[in-house]
């Protein structure tokens, strides 16, 4: 991981710096493979961490997690440590049980440069009143997606949306689902930017739920 430097007066980025057009162009982890309740999960990569968004359809008896790790390691820490999650190791594989929907990180040998975040959230179905839908298995480039009154934005599990979301003086907005909103096109590599990733100004009755938000140029929301 390169050193990240905060710039209080970053160079303005007026247009997205790049686009992605297929899942083949998305950055995937080559360090971790994750399975939850027998279902293989997509594991994404950034230069600061790896992450696996997991949409859970009902907790039932919790979540059984298996992680296959491609490099040798000795020590493992699952955080927050206050959760008291115990793991079982077999060679390069870890297994543990999450008693409910929660978000945890897995650290290897105290290395904070490549943790794995397992981000569990309840599965959110597409509402009938959806006005903007990003579908599973597709990559989108929205630059700045401007919302209006009563917009319902649905990011389906398995969708990746590159860009940011903006609204001003709007009412009854929803941004929901289990997909990913990625703000990396809006800042220079290894530096911050000036724009909020989800920028909702003087809006009323706003719901944001379920989505995974990463790599913002500034504050996420």
Language model features with spans:
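Extracellular/periplasmic carbohydrate-active domains that bind, remodel
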Residues: 1-221
């Amino acid at each position: 991981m390169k050193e990240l430097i905060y710039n209080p007066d970053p160079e303005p980025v007026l247009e997205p710096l790049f686009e992605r057009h297929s899942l083949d162009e998305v950055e995937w982890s080559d360090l971790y493979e994750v399975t939850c309740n027998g279902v293989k999960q997509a594991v994404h990569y950034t230069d600061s961490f790896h992450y696996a968004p997991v949409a859970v359809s009902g907790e039932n008896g919790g979540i059984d997690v298996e992680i296959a790790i491609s490099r040798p390691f000795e020590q493992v820490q699952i955080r927050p440590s206050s959760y008291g999650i115990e793991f079982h190791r077999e060679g390069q594989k870890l297994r543990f049980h999450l008693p409910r929907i929660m978000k945890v990180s897995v650290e290897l040998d105290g290395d904070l440069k490549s943790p794995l975040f397992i981000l569990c959230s309840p599965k959110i179905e597409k509402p009938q009143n959806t006005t903007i839908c990003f579908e599973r298995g597709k990559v989108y480039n929205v630059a700045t997606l401007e919302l209006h009154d009563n917009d319902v934005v649905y990011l389906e599990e398995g969708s990746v949306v590159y860009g940011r979301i903006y609204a001003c003086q709007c009412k009854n907005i929803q941004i929901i689902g289990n997909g990913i909103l990625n703000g990396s096109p809006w800042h220079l590599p290894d530096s911050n930017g000036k724009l909020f990733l989800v920028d909702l100004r003087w809006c009323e009755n706003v719901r944001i739920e379920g989505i995974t938000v990463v790599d913002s140029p500034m504050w996420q929301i």
